[in-house]
Amino acid sequence: MAMSSFLINSNYVDPKFPPCEEYSQSDYLPSDHSPGYYAGGQRRESSFQPEAGFGRRAACTVQRYAACRDPGPPPPPPPPPPPPPPPGLSPRAPAPPPAGALLPEPGQRCEAVSSSPPPPPCAQNPLHPSPSHSACKEPVVYPWMRKVHVSTVNPNYAGGEPKRSRTAYTRQQVLELEKEFHYNRYLTRRRRVEIAHALCLSERQIKIWFQNRRMKWKKDHKLPNTKIRSGGAAGSAGGPPGRPNGGPRAL
Protein backbone atom coordinates (compact mmCIF):
# COMPACT_ATOMS: atom_id res chain seq x y z
CA MET A 1 0.00 0.00 0.00
CA ALA A 2 2.83 2.36 0.84
CA MET A 3 4.63 1.66 -2.46
CA SER A 4 1.52 2.21 -4.52
CA SER A 5 0.85 5.48 -2.77
CA PHE A 6 4.47 6.47 -3.29
CA LEU A 7 4.29 5.78 -7.01
CA ILE A 8 1.01 7.57 -7.37
CA ASN A 9 1.93 10.60 -5.29
CA SER A 10 5.53 10.97 -6.57
CA ASN A 11 6.17 13.33 -9.41
CA TYR A 12 7.68 10.71 -11.74
CA VAL A 13 8.55 11.84 -15.22
CA ASP A 14 9.28 9.43 -18.07
CA PRO A 15 12.76 9.94 -19.51
CA LYS A 16 13.08 10.83 -23.12
CA PHE A 17 15.99 9.44 -25.13
CA PRO A 18 17.29 10.99 -28.32
CA PRO A 19 16.79 9.05 -31.54
CA CYS A 20 19.29 6.48 -32.75
CA GLU A 21 20.76 8.82 -35.35
CA GLU A 22 22.01 11.13 -32.61
CA TYR A 23 23.66 8.22 -30.78
CA SER A 24 25.47 7.15 -33.92
CA GLN A 25 26.57 10.69 -34.71
CA SER A 26 27.88 11.31 -31.22
CA ASP A 27 29.77 7.93 -31.25
CA TYR A 28 27.67 6.42 -28.50
CA LEU A 29 27.13 3.24 -30.58
CA PRO A 30 30.07 2.04 -32.67
CA SER A 31 29.42 1.48 -36.34
CA ASP A 32 29.78 -1.86 -38.04
CA HIS A 33 33.14 -0.87 -39.55
CA SER A 34 34.55 0.79 -36.46
CA PRO A 35 38.01 -0.65 -35.52
CA GLY A 36 37.38 -0.07 -31.83
CA TYR A 37 34.47 -2.44 -31.82
CA TYR A 38 36.67 -5.39 -32.81
CA ALA A 39 39.46 -4.35 -30.47
CA GLY A 40 37.08 -4.20 -27.56
CA GLY A 41 35.78 -7.66 -28.39
CA GLN A 42 39.31 -9.07 -28.54
CA ARG A 43 40.21 -7.53 -25.21
CA ARG A 44 37.00 -8.88 -23.75
CA GLU A 45 37.80 -12.41 -25.00
CA SER A 46 41.40 -12.33 -23.74
CA SER A 47 40.31 -11.18 -20.32
CA PHE A 48 37.87 -14.09 -19.99
CA GLN A 49 39.97 -16.85 -18.36
CA PRO A 50 37.51 -19.78 -18.47
CA GLU A 51 37.32 -19.53 -22.24
CA ALA A 52 41.14 -19.56 -22.47
CA GLY A 53 41.33 -22.67 -20.28
CA PHE A 54 38.73 -24.41 -22.41
CA GLY A 55 40.81 -23.61 -25.50
CA ARG A 56 43.93 -25.26 -23.99
CA ARG A 57 41.92 -28.33 -23.04
CA ALA A 58 40.59 -28.63 -26.57
CA ALA A 59 44.09 -28.29 -27.99
CA CYS A 60 45.34 -31.11 -25.71
CA THR A 61 42.42 -33.27 -26.77
CA VAL A 62 43.13 -32.62 -30.44
CA GLN A 63 46.81 -33.42 -29.98
CA ARG A 64 45.98 -36.62 -28.08
CA TYR A 65 43.58 -37.81 -30.78
CA ALA A 66 46.08 -36.90 -33.48
CA ALA A 67 48.77 -38.95 -31.71
CA CYS A 68 46.41 -41.92 -31.53
CA ARG A 69 45.51 -41.69 -35.21
CA ASP A 70 49.09 -41.36 -36.48
CA PRO A 71 50.59 -44.89 -36.51
CA GLY A 72 54.14 -43.66 -36.99
CA PRO A 73 56.77 -45.35 -39.17
CA PRO A 74 56.06 -49.02 -40.06
CA PRO A 75 58.05 -51.65 -38.10
CA PRO A 76 60.98 -53.30 -39.87
CA PRO A 77 60.20 -56.63 -41.63
CA PRO A 78 60.95 -59.81 -39.64
CA PRO A 79 64.22 -61.62 -40.40
CA PRO A 80 63.97 -64.54 -42.90
CA PRO A 81 63.76 -68.06 -41.40
CA PRO A 82 66.99 -70.09 -41.26
CA PRO A 83 67.53 -72.61 -44.11
CA PRO A 84 66.56 -76.23 -43.35
CA PRO A 85 69.44 -78.57 -42.38
CA PRO A 86 70.76 -80.93 -45.10
CA PRO A 87 69.34 -84.48 -45.06
CA GLY A 88 71.25 -87.01 -43.00
CA LEU A 89 72.40 -84.58 -40.32
CA SER A 90 70.80 -84.38 -36.91
CA PRO A 91 68.76 -81.17 -36.48
CA ARG A 92 70.23 -78.72 -34.02
CA ALA A 93 68.42 -76.34 -31.71
CA PRO A 94 67.66 -72.99 -33.42
CA ALA A 95 69.97 -70.14 -32.51
CA PRO A 96 68.40 -67.35 -30.41
CA PRO A 97 67.54 -64.19 -32.36
CA PRO A 98 69.71 -61.10 -31.89
CA ALA A 99 68.82 -58.56 -29.22
CA GLY A 100 67.67 -55.87 -31.67
CA ALA A 101 65.58 -58.15 -33.91
CA LEU A 102 61.82 -58.19 -33.63
CA LEU A 103 60.13 -61.52 -33.10
CA PRO A 104 57.55 -62.37 -35.80
CA GLU A 105 53.93 -62.90 -35.01
CA PRO A 106 52.68 -66.46 -34.31
CA GLY A 107 50.86 -66.53 -37.64
CA GLN A 108 54.00 -65.51 -39.53
CA ARG A 109 56.08 -68.14 -37.71
CA CYS A 110 53.64 -70.87 -38.73
CA GLU A 111 53.72 -69.75 -42.35
CA ALA A 112 57.51 -69.74 -42.37
CA VAL A 113 57.66 -73.27 -41.01
CA SER A 114 55.07 -74.59 -43.45
CA SER A 115 56.83 -73.00 -46.44
CA SER A 116 60.01 -75.04 -45.87
CA PRO A 117 60.37 -77.92 -48.39
CA PRO A 118 59.55 -81.42 -47.10
CA PRO A 119 62.42 -83.85 -46.58
CA PRO A 120 63.26 -85.91 -49.67
CA PRO A 121 61.90 -89.46 -49.76
CA CYS A 122 64.15 -92.42 -49.23
CA ALA A 123 64.43 -93.09 -52.97
CA GLN A 124 66.11 -89.65 -53.56
CA ASN A 125 68.78 -90.02 -50.86
CA PRO A 126 71.26 -92.68 -52.06
CA LEU A 127 74.28 -91.17 -50.25
CA HIS A 128 72.91 -91.75 -46.75
CA PRO A 129 71.42 -95.25 -46.51
CA SER A 130 69.01 -95.87 -43.69
CA PRO A 131 66.71 -98.72 -42.59
CA SER A 132 63.72 -96.94 -44.12
CA HIS A 133 65.61 -96.66 -47.44
CA SER A 134 66.19 -100.41 -47.57
CA ALA A 135 62.56 -101.07 -46.67
CA CYS A 136 61.27 -98.95 -49.57
CA LYS A 137 62.79 -101.14 -52.32
CA GLU A 138 62.18 -104.87 -52.49
CA PRO A 139 65.22 -107.11 -52.96
CA VAL A 140 65.96 -107.88 -56.59
CA VAL A 141 66.19 -111.55 -57.58
CA TYR A 142 68.43 -111.97 -60.62
CA PRO A 143 68.13 -114.95 -63.01
CA TRP A 144 71.35 -116.54 -61.75
CA MET A 145 69.89 -116.51 -58.21
CA ARG A 146 66.91 -118.64 -59.25
CA LYS A 147 66.87 -122.42 -58.99
CA VAL A 148 64.87 -124.43 -61.46
CA HIS A 149 64.39 -127.41 -59.16
CA VAL A 150 62.88 -125.19 -56.46
CA SER A 151 59.12 -124.81 -56.73
CA THR A 152 58.96 -121.18 -55.59
CA VAL A 153 61.62 -118.49 -55.32
CA ASN A 154 61.34 -116.59 -52.05
CA PRO A 155 63.21 -113.24 -52.13
CA ASN A 156 63.08 -113.01 -48.31
CA TYR A 157 64.80 -116.38 -47.84
CA ALA A 158 67.38 -116.09 -45.01
CA GLY A 159 69.45 -119.25 -45.49
CA GLY A 160 69.49 -123.03 -45.41
CA GLU A 161 68.77 -125.51 -48.18
CA PRO A 162 65.04 -125.61 -49.01
CA LYS A 163 63.21 -128.84 -49.66
CA ARG A 164 63.39 -129.78 -53.32
CA SER A 165 60.17 -130.43 -55.14
CA ARG A 166 59.62 -133.16 -57.74
CA THR A 167 60.38 -131.95 -61.25
CA ALA A 168 57.48 -132.37 -63.65
CA TYR A 169 58.90 -133.09 -67.12
CA THR A 170 56.81 -132.31 -70.15
CA ARG A 171 55.94 -134.91 -72.80
CA GLN A 172 58.41 -133.38 -75.26
CA GLN A 173 61.23 -133.44 -72.70
CA VAL A 174 60.55 -137.09 -71.77
CA LEU A 175 60.47 -138.07 -75.45
CA GLU A 176 63.85 -136.46 -76.16
CA LEU A 177 65.38 -138.00 -73.03
CA GLU A 178 64.09 -141.47 -73.97
CA LYS A 179 65.63 -141.12 -77.44
CA GLU A 180 68.98 -140.19 -75.95
CA PHE A 181 68.80 -143.04 -73.43
CA HIS A 182 68.02 -145.54 -76.22
CA TYR A 183 71.28 -144.69 -77.97
CA ASN A 184 73.48 -144.10 -74.94
CA ARG A 185 72.69 -144.92 -71.32
CA TYR A 186 75.67 -142.89 -70.01
CA LEU A 187 76.25 -139.30 -70.99
CA THR A 188 79.42 -137.28 -71.10
CA ARG A 189 79.63 -133.84 -69.58
CA ARG A 190 79.58 -132.16 -72.98
CA ARG A 191 76.53 -134.09 -74.19
CA ARG A 192 74.75 -133.42 -70.89
CA VAL A 193 75.26 -129.66 -71.31
CA GLU A 194 73.92 -129.79 -74.88
CA ILE A 195 70.77 -131.67 -73.84
CA ALA A 196 70.21 -129.33 -70.88
CA HIS A 197 70.33 -126.26 -73.15
CA ALA A 198 68.13 -127.90 -75.77
CA LEU A 199 65.40 -128.93 -73.29
CA CYS A 200 65.67 -125.86 -70.98
CA LEU A 201 66.70 -128.03 -68.04
CA SER A 202 69.66 -128.02 -65.69
CA GLU A 203 72.56 -130.46 -65.78
CA ARG A 204 71.51 -131.81 -62.40
CA GLN A 205 68.04 -132.65 -63.70
CA ILE A 206 69.50 -134.48 -66.72
CA LYS A 207 71.88 -136.41 -64.50
CA ILE A 208 69.16 -137.47 -62.02
CA TRP A 209 66.79 -138.48 -64.82
CA PHE A 210 69.41 -140.76 -66.39
CA GLN A 211 70.22 -142.32 -63.01
CA ASN A 212 66.58 -143.13 -62.37
CA ARG A 213 66.10 -144.39 -65.92
CA ARG A 214 69.08 -146.78 -65.60
CA MET A 215 67.71 -148.19 -62.33
CA LYS A 216 64.36 -148.80 -63.99
CA TRP A 217 66.00 -150.44 -67.00
CA LYS A 218 67.96 -152.85 -64.76
CA LYS A 219 64.83 -153.70 -62.83
CA ASP A 220 62.91 -154.40 -66.02
CA HIS A 221 65.65 -156.67 -67.34
CA LYS A 222 66.18 -158.33 -63.95
CA LEU A 223 69.80 -157.47 -63.83
CA PRO A 224 71.68 -157.50 -60.51
CA ASN A 225 72.28 -154.19 -58.82
CA THR A 226 75.87 -153.29 -59.39
CA LYS A 227 76.03 -151.14 -56.27
CA ILE A 228 74.91 -153.95 -53.90
CA ARG A 229 77.12 -156.52 -55.67
CA SER A 230 80.17 -154.31 -55.51
CA GLY A 231 79.56 -153.64 -51.82
CA GLY A 232 79.30 -157.39 -51.00
CA ALA A 233 82.42 -158.22 -52.98
CA ALA A 234 84.35 -155.55 -51.13
CA GLY A 235 83.18 -156.97 -47.77
CA SER A 236 84.17 -160.56 -48.64
CA ALA A 237 87.56 -159.50 -49.93
CA GLY A 238 88.30 -157.58 -46.76
CA GLY A 239 87.62 -160.56 -44.38
CA PRO A 240 90.27 -162.40 -42.27
CA PRO A 241 92.21 -165.25 -43.94
CA GLY A 242 90.74 -167.91 -41.59
CA ARG A 243 87.23 -167.19 -42.90
CA PRO A 244 87.03 -167.89 -46.58
CA ASN A 245 84.12 -166.23 -48.37
CA GLY A 246 83.09 -164.57 -45.14
CA GLY A 247 81.93 -167.82 -43.47
CA PRO A 248 81.99 -168.61 -39.74
CA ARG A 249 85.30 -169.50 -38.12
CA ALA A 250 85.95 -173.20 -37.63
CA LEU A 251 86.11 -174.35 -34.05
Swiss-Prot record:
Q: Which InterPro entries match?
A: Antp_homeobox_Deformed_sf, HD, HD_metazoa, Homeobox_antennapedia, Homeobox_Antennapedia_CS, Homeobox_CS, Homeodomain-like_sf
Asked whether the UniProt record includes Nucleus among its keywords, one would answer yes
What keywords appear on the UniProt entry? Developmental protein, DNA-binding, Homeobox, Nucleus, Phosphoprotein, Transcription, Transcription regulation
GO:BP terms for this protein?
anterior/posterior pattern specification; bone marrow development; definitive hemopoiesis; embryonic skeletal system morphogenesis; hematopoietic stem cell differentiation; hematopoietic stem cell proliferation; morphogenesis of an epithelial sheet; negative regulation of transcription by RNA polymerase II
Q: Where is the composition biased (Polar residues)?
A: 1-12
Segments carrying the region annotation (Disordered) are: 1-134, 220-251
The UniProt function text for this chain reads: Sequence-specific transcription factor which is part of a developmental regulatory system that provides cells with specific positional identities on the anterior-posterior axis.
What is this protein's record name?
Homeobox protein Hox-B4
Lineage of the native species?
Answer: Eukaryota, Metazoa, Chordata, Craniata, Vertebrata
